[in-house]
Amino acid sequence: MTTIGIDAKRIVRNGTGLGSYGRTLVNDLIRMGDSQLALRLYAPDEGREELREQIIGDGNVQFCYPTGHPSSLRKTWWRSRSVVDDLVEDGVDLYHGLSGELPMGLRKKHIRSVVTIHDLIFMRHPEYYQWLDTRIYEWKFRHALREADRIIAISERTRQDIIELGGEACADRISLIYQSFAPRFSAEVKAERKAQVKERYKLPQRYVLNVGTMERRKNLALVAEAVELLPQDIHLVAVGRQTDYVKELPHDDRIHLLNGVPDSDLAAIYSMAEAFAYPSRYEGFGIPIIEAIAVGLPVVACTGSCLEEAGGPHSLYVDPDNVIEMAEALKMSLRGARGRDERIRKSREYIRRFEGNDVARQVAQLYQSLL
């Protein structure tokens, strides 16, 4: 039996982003059905029950927490240092940090390690972060590079950034393994379910969808302004955590901002949209693009980072500062537009490379290569 320890903080706390990556990867590994692989998920606390419950029940999977009722400071210390003692006690053979960081002391305890690095936006674009946060993230990144036996980059863009900003010496330890998407996004959503979700969120009849944190880097204003140039019955629905950035969006009754939407409702919201817009200025990958394509939506994204890797050659890409380009691309993506259905079909073929069984197999092979 091989025991893999996994950093589960984001799995139990984050509804989207890093949390989705972790839950999807763990479930993909479970679906492989390898009876000789045991997963131990290490989290500083139990987090959100509805997120823990998304992990498929399996006898070879177990959540692990610090003992007692530690303070926030002790939880941080446990995750960054003393969790290593628990790994030794639990007989962990390899530890996987899912969010770009690793605890201190793994090498001293002879525990092999893998770290997934999603992006280096805090180094490429520090203007989007607080100064102290940037310093902390950079320290964690450089520590992970020193500590990790292997590094997973979730996109070619991220792989190149790691080499450029972390040094050529780490290049031979990097594996490019894309992230996958949850199976629920490729499953048909029943009409009754759509009706329930539409009523719950008071969704308009026709809308362009955006999913992601509403912050400056995500550039939602570009889509909001573009929608004003579309027919009057086309609305914008944006789903995600809101920041002060939303105050800069146009005041328009065709703009609907949804916060706190559970994962269980997302597929239905995707399925009722006419197009998906992802105008982010910089990403490590862009998993919402794949989710949208899996549901069957045409995608319009922006140039400048790595979104072409996620969306493939049959999505549309525009300048992140050009409202007219975004509006024209969205017009080409509405129901009835010429070539729309063919673009959707070819895009769905493209994202087959991101299916969970292939991703899990690559990650499992990486684990085995270190043991």
Q: What do these predicted ranges mean?
A:
Residues 1-371:
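Carbohydrate transferase catalytic cores enriched for Leloir-type hexosyltransferases
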